[in-house]
């Protein structure tokens, strides 16, 4: 662990390796009024993001920058444990997903019922385009979003279905609306960058309210995907874990961007990469870590770097033994080699979580960009 100090605050960094661009973003945050009075902690999977660092957790005060939560509000992983009596038909699973779960930019042709009237309930509902919102519920998206089946290493009959997705296009629109509002409000404030412009007062209250709705939307989106797959495959749910990594925990005033809650006794999942699986963990409730843990292994290559530096031959070799029809040029930027070695994460997180087991992939679906 080392510490970075700035004009308004400091950040403790729980990482062995931090790229220069991520370091610059941490320094910028510590030089921002957002850092004043905040406990800032940087997780082991830290890497540079679009305008702000990923792997961030910080306590919030009377100022919040929507960009720190990001455009995929409420993104996370829904994990469902099951024990199929007759094994898994991977060809059927792949067909079921491809035929029924839109991915990439695809959405449904018809609206999906949702318990919240977004136009009426969202404070910004009449200022954004909601035409895609109801058609996007139950869709995966692209990038690092995935559907995966992981085998338990402790129970030979046990498997975890994992779905990583978020609030889709509607979350992006909500964040964009409020970040633009923040830029307007901070336009004349000296030393406040566009990326770290913030909301206060009634505008902050409106954002927090709408963000909460988006977190619920993201949860229902993941749950719908996972639960429908369980039904189509005839799998019985035994237990589940919900792990969110782009949100504000309003009960405890903790912002997490690319980090997850690790309260004492809380089960959580840390996905590593499409070859090495995920860590099933239990939180220790470490206050110095802001009761948080990393949300993954963290990238060591940008998407463009991965596409330039990783060969298809190496990608195919890395994925041997895992059923997938998604190893292609379009997903090369998500290859295992684009991420940090998971052993680095395992070696650091012992202060904040107990690792129950590492589950290993037997099936992976990931849409190309």
Locate the predicted segments by residue.
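A generic, well-ordered mixed alpha/beta core segment in the N-terminal half of proteins
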Residues: 66-123
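Acidic active-site catalytic centers that drive phospho-/nucleotidyl reactions
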Residues: 44-45, 72
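Domain-length cofactor-binding catalytic modules of enzymes
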Residues: 2-28, 35-42, 48-56, 62-66, ...
């Amino acid at each position: 662990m080392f510490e970075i100090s700035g004009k308004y605050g400091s950040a403790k960094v729980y990482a062995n390796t931090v790229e220069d661009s991520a370091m610059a973003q941490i320094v910028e945050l510590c030089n921002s009024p957002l850092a004043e009075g905040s406990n800032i902690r940087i997780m082991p999977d830290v890497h540079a993001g679009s305008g702000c660092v990923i792997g961030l957790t910080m306590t919030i005060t009377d100022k919040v920058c929507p960009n720190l939560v990001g455009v995929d509000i409420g993104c996370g992983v829904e994990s469902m444990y099951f024990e199929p009596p007759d094994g898994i038909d991977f060809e059927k699973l792949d067909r079921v997903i491809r035929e029924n779960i839109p991915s990439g930019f695809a959405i449904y042709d018809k609206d999906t019922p949702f318990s919240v009237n977004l136009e009426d309930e969202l404070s910004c509902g009449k200022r954004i385009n909601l035409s895609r919102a109801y058609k996007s519920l139950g869709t995966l998206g692209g990038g690092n979003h995935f559907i995966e089946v992981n085998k338990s290493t402790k129970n030979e009959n046990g498997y975890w279905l994992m779905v990583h997705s978020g609030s889709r296009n509607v979350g992006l629109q909500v964040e964009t609306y409020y970040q633009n509002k923040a830029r307007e409000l901070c336009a004349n404030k000296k030393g406040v960058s566009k990326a770290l412009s913030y909301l206060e007062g009634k505008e902050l209250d409106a954002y927090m309210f709408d963000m909460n709705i988006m977190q619920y939307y993201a949860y229902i989106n993941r749950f719908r995907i996972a639960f429908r797959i369980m039904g189509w495959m005839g799998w019985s749910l035994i237990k589940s874990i919900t792990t969110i990594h782009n949100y504000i925990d309003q009960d405890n005033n903790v912002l997490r961007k690319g980090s997850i809650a690790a309260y004492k006794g809380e089960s959580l999942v840390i996905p590593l990469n499409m070859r090495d699986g995920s860590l099933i963990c239990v939180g220790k409730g470490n206050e110095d870590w802001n009761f948080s843990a990393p949300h993954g292994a963290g990238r060591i290559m940008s998407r463009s770097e991965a596409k330039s530096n990783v060969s298809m031959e190496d990608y195919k070799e890395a994925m041997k033994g895992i059923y997938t029809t998604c190893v292609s040029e379009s997903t090369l930027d998500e290859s295992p080699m684009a991420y940090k070695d998971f052993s680095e994460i395992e070696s650091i997180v012992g202060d904040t979580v107990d690792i129950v087991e590492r589950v290993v992939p037997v099936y992976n679906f990931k849409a190309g960009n």
